[in-house]
Amino acid sequence: MKKNLLTLAAVLCWWVAIPIITSCSTDNDDNPVTPIEPEALAECTIMWYGTGGGNVDPYILTDFRQFYDARPESFDRVNIVAQYKASLNPSVYRDMTDEEVSQKAEELAAGKTVDELEAMTMEDYFFLFHPKRGATYRFAVDPAKTLRQQMLETEPYGAMNCNFTCPDSLTNFINWAARTYPAKRYILVMADHGGGYLPNHDVAEAAATRGMVFDDGYENGNTIGNKHKCFSAKSFARGVRNADVRPEGIVLYLCLMNNLEFLYDVKDVTDHIVCSTYTLWGTIGAMQSLPDNMAAGLDTRAALANFVDANVDSWDNNLYNPDHPEEPNYYDMTLTETKRLNDLAPVLKEFTDRLVDTYQNGTAEQRAAIDECTANAVKVVNQYSLYDMAKYMESLSLMLPDVFDYAFYDRFADAFNACIVHQRYARYLTNHNYQVDYSMMLAVKGCYVCYDYDTTDTKLQAATAYYPDGTTTTSKYVLGDDSGDGHYEFQENGTWPSTFADTYQQTTFDRLVGWSRWLLLNETAPPAWCPSSFNFELPSDDMSEIPVL
């Protein structure tokens, strides 16, 4: 399904505002698996690069295990290779000794057939091969074996607790894959946590921009919040760019990565990129559809579009309840043609120019309208300051038609639609004609807030404000009386390892668009909560007259 942004006239019909360190590379690139030499060059090599980030090891490996479900004939034309780093302290057996882990694995496997072992829960299955803490494994998928069998027979690669998020490590892996399993085309898949755009996740090197793939074996310099070292957009792009081959597509099996600040920094290292605006579901996707579609000889764009559909359909089949169709589900996938982002940038810059000028020099009524739109921006995750870009711009265009006229909005819609090759989102969202768009950051005078929620009952626990000068203030949320009211109490001051000027303002997105001008100027706080994190029910009125996006 190709999503098309509506013209401004159509928007008027339906819009409603909703209030250098040791790396995993070594001098010895010996392949731990003996490859089978193909009679002809393979159609594609899929390169999977993932780590557990402390608490998702079983989930990403359950997703990876789906590759073994690809059609047998697909393995004749497609290679699948992997590099996986086990968390240094995986949550599954965080409080157990190595001896206790081995004992439980033996107990779980006792008397079980191969099929029974493969049918185990994700956590129990992880115990069956219990990778060494902080070890890195490199191997190629052998369809004659199971993931468990391959993990048990694969020796750790490189140094223990290597820096998995070092660009050299990623480059080394891609080069090994291309040299050992050459193919006509290459697809890179990244698996772990996605951090959303956060300047405080920027590492010191190269004015980086985004956090993804969090290595629990290393710290990044934050005194508050997520301390794990991670890839930034620039360090990730450098790892891909320095490789000997260029992937035609990149799949980010990570949450929150369909973000403009990230996409602009990686747009030149691949032709197509697949990622999600909201959080994505692990363990119930359709990873096997990727080799099956590539083996069928489809062009990369068509194969990735089918992959998007297969994953979201699988999530729907597992999560959508036809007896309760109004039960909220928020998930999505978008396929972007990266070169089209170049045409979107000047339109976004013009939008920013008009917004900043109106806020500074417009009437009191215009400024109030802008504040109202900001206060009702649609957030995509509770914890981070990421907001739906198109909905925000649509609301501003609706409220300020004298500033953002029909002709301008239509130019924006055309450039926006050209970027999106294919998109699919939850059946629940589709039934409500609820579009899902790229995210971007919002801030107040350059300050943004990260919220810590109890994921069990979605109660707010704390909030950390990140200031442009690199300082932070964390306040604990204290419940009030029986009415449910609460208040913030100061907890501590801290720092993050850089400044707004050295992080956000060095992004490709900001250099092209100048969005930081608005982030530093805006004086209205955007919403602290998002519909998806609280499973917010969209309006259940008859939606039949609302045009399909």
Could you tell me what each predicted segment is?
Residues D30, E37-I60, R71, K85-S91, ...:
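Cell-envelope and extracellular/periplasmic
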Residues M1-L12:
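Bacterial N-terminal signal peptides that target proteins for export
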Residues V33, V203-L549:
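Terminal, contiguous helix-loop blocks that mediate binding/assembly
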